[in-house]
Amino acid sequence: MATVSRKRKKVKVTPEGVVHIKASFNNVMVTITDVQGNTVSWSSAGKNGFRGSKKNTPYASQVTSEAAAKEAFDLGMRNVQVFIKGPGAGRDAAIRALQGAGLEVRSIRDITPLPHNGCRPPKRRRV
């Protein structure tokens, strides 16, 4: 069965925005929103064709950030604040890719949640 392709409305956005980067051990997700929190563009490593263990590499993080940033740049976004969350590989590569795509990074904040000795962590891997 053929899928119906929907045409997205191209809405111009304000030049200020917020980039949320979630870098887990298994994947990287980048969401770009306006200041109010409405999503302008998003991307993930899986959406960009990476599968399995390749999703948590710095290169996958770079490609994911470039894809989301290019779409936001085309809609008129220029300056962004970056909120980064999670322990995954490629956190720095994602920020550098945002700058390479033409977005000016105004501030970077690490909002990784840290427990005050809450849940017991999973046991250590023995490889």
From Swiss-Prot:
Q: Is Iron-sulfur found in the keyword set?
A: no
- What is any one of the record's Gene Ontology cellular component terms? ribosome
Q: Does the keyword Thylakoid apply?
A: no
Q: Which Pfam families match?
A: Ribosomal_S11 (PF00411)
One example of a Gene Ontology biological process annotation: translation
GO molecular-function annotation terms?
rRNA binding; structural constituent of ribosome
UniProt keyword list: Ribonucleoprotein, Ribosomal protein, RNA-binding, rRNA-binding
Give the domain of life.
Bacteria
Cross-referenced Gene3D superfamilies, in alphabetical order?
Answer: Ribosomal protein S11 (3.30.420.80)
Described by its record, this protein's role is as follows: Located on the platform of the 30S subunit, it bridges several disparate RNA helices of the 16S rRNA. Forms part of the Shine-Dalgarno cleft in the 70S ribosome.
Q: Which family does it belong to?
A: Belongs to the universal ribosomal protein uS11 family.
PANTHER family hit by this protein? 40S RIBOSOMAL PROTEIN S14/30S RIBOSOMAL PROTEIN S11
Q: How does it assemble?
A: Part of the 30S ribosomal subunit. Interacts with proteins S7 and S18. Binds to IF-3.
Name of the protein described by the UniProt record = Small ribosomal subunit protein uS11
| Gene behind the chain | rpsK
